[in-house]
Structures are given as C-alpha cells and as structure tokens.
C-alpha cells in the first residue's frame, strides 16, 4: 500500500502520536506528507532539542501552535507564526523581544524575567499571562486585557488589575505593586499574596478557594472573615489566628510562628496539615480524615494529639513528643 492511499485523518493521528524526531523524518518521506503533516508542538520537547531551535528552523514550521523559547537567545522573532497560541519567552537571555511578538494573538504567554517584552495589550484573546520578576511588562502593557490567570509576583510595574472581571487566579507575591485598590471587586478562585504588604482584605471574595497569605502578608483575621476556603497558606503569618469556621477547608499550612492555635482549628476536617514548628497546635486526633501530617521540631502535637489517626504520610522529624505510630495501619511514608 502506498502511503497516499492511507486516509489523511489516519495519517494525522499516527503523526500526532509520534515523537519529535519521528515526526521530522515522517514529513520528509514524500512531498505529500511534507505538505499535509505539520508539527504544531515545539513546547513539549526535550531540552537537547529546545536548545537547538533557531529562527531559521522555526521558519520552516509555520503552523506551530505551542513554542518554548525560554532562555533561548537564538530565537528573537516569532511574529510570522499566525497560528501560535502558547509561547514561553521567559528568562533574561531569551531573545524574543517586543518586535518579535508583534501582531500575535496568543492565549498564553510566559514572559517572566524577560526585560525585552513590554506591551501585550494588543493580544485581545490572551487568557494567561506570566509577567513576574524582571519582566518589562507594565501597567500600560496590560491595558484592556481580559485575563483569567495573571502572575505578577515581584513585578513593581503592575499595580492595578481591578477591571479584569473574569480573572480567577492572581499571584502578587513579594515585590508586586498590586495593592488593595488594584484588586477591588475581583471575584477570584485562587490568590497568592505572600510577602505582599499592600493587600490586607479579601473578605468579599466569596468564591475564593485557595489563599496564600504567608510570611509578611498584611492579610489579617478581619481580612479573611467569612471566606469558605479549601486550601490556606498562613505560614509565618502573625495576623491570622482562627480558621475554625472554614468547614470545607482540607489543606492548612500553619507552620513557624503562625498564630493559628488549637482553638483556631477547632472542628476542622482536614486532609493535610502542616504544623511544623508551631507550638500552639497540640491535638489533631479529632481529624478522622487526616491523611498527611507534618509535625516537625517544636510542633506542639504529641502522642495524645495523634490518637486514632489513620495517616498515609507523617513527618515528625525531631519531634520527641511522638513516639508510637504502630496503630497507623495505612502509613506508607514516614519521614
């Protein structure tokens, strides 16, 4: 049977299931395969292939939808890729610059630490943007965007995203300039504000399910009032003390000098608890669905505090208050 006798749909299915090198060779068999079979994924490649990508190589593949050019100084222009939807142009040595993305209509862009890209406001279908660190994208550069996910951690050039009514995930870690006014009215599902001293209150976000308010975050007890979280990071946060009303909370990170204490976890039905070095929590025996417990060092949890638990994973390193775990029949990881 000649290859041209195989239905094109079948050929395309075989082609998509092949690895990268096989695809390259398969296209070169006949003019027919070269014309009709196109490699669209230049993102999920092994590092040794990614490092070899250049402008000239990419120009031979004009149907690319997914491209990873992070830390690749040999790629600076992808503007000809009219089908491109996802681009990773992160890293300080990535060659892709402002001119190199002109007229692109991406869905997802990673420009973390790329100081050559400043403006993506023309990408009206952009839904995910990573503009963290030493990225040059500033407030004007995101004007009018309707994102679903934004990472602007440690980016002091972006301070306001409150018009993005469809935004669901926001990362404003550390030196991000996004402040209280900059998130006003947002209806997020996931928010990271760890070590961000400019945001204090997220209590109106009734659909928020995951909050990271660790470290020097200014979010306090009033700032989480009424939230119905599934996952909370409050490590080293001295302003949050009580989360006992969060009946759907399944994962709690409250280690270090977190102020969350025994009363603050009363009645919770967690699956995973991190209480390393937290001397204020001493008993979790009532958490009958708890599967992972981290009670390292000066954590207050003792033998009585784990009575009857059926854990899968336990880390009680340097905690001399826990001596017997023989009753945990399903324990398979002990650290």
What are these regions (language model features)?
Residues 44-50, 67-74, 88-96, 106, ...:
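Concave beta-strand-loop units of leucine-rich repeat
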Residues 1-32:
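N-terminal Skp1-binding subsegment of the F-box domain
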Residues 61-65, 70, 83:
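Leucine-enriched alpha-helical scaffold segments used for protein-protein interaction
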Residues 23, 34, 38-59:
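Hydrophobic regular-secondary-structure patch
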Residues 53-60, 75-80, 95-102, 117-122, ...:
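Short, T/G/N/S-enriched strand-turn elements that build extracellular solenoid repeat scaffolds
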Residues 327-330, 334-335:
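Low-complexity/repetitive intrinsically disordered segments
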């Amino acid at each position: 049977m000649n290859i041209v006798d195989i239905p094109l749909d079948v050929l395309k299915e075989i082609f998509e299931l092949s690895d990268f090198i096989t695809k390259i060779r398969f296209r070169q068999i006949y003019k027919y395969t070269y014309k009709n079979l196109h490699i669209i994924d230049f993102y999920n490649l092994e590092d040794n292939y990614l490092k070899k990508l250049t402008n000239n190589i990419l120009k031979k593949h004009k149907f690319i939808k997914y491209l990873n050019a992070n830390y690749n100084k040999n790629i600076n222009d992808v503007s000809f890729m009219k089908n491109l939807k996802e681009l990773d142009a992160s890293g300080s040595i990535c060659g892709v610059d402002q001119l190199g993305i002109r007229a692109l209509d991406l869905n997802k862009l990673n420009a973390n630490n790329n100081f050559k890209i400043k403006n993506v406001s023309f990408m009206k279908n952009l839904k995910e943007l990573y503009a963290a660190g030493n990225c040059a994208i500033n407030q004007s550069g995101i004007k009018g965007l309707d994102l679903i996910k934004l990472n602007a951690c440690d980016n002091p050039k972006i301070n306001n995203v409150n018009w993005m009514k469809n935004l669901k995930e926001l990362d404003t870690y550390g030196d991000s300039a996004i402040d209280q006014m900059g998130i006003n009215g947002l209806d997020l599902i996931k928010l990271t504000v760890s070590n961000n001293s400019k945001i204090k209150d997220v209590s109106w976000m009734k659909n928020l399910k995951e909050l990271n308010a660790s470290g020097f975050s200014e979010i306090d007890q009033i700032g989480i009032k009424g939230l119905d979280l599934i996952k909370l990071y409050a490590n080293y946060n001295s302003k949050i003390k009580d989360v006992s009303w969060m009946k759907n909370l399944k994962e709690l990170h409250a280690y270090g000098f977190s102020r969350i204490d025994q009363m603050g976890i009363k009645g919770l039905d967690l699956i995973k608890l991190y209480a390393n070095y937290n001397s204020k929590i001493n008993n979790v025996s009532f958490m009958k669905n708890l599967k992972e417990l981290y009670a390292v060092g000066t954590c207050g949890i003792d033998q009585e505090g784990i009575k009857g638990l059926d854990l899968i994973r336990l880390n009680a390193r340097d905690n001399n208050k826990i001596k017997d775990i023989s009753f945990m029949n399903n324990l398979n990881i002990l650290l």
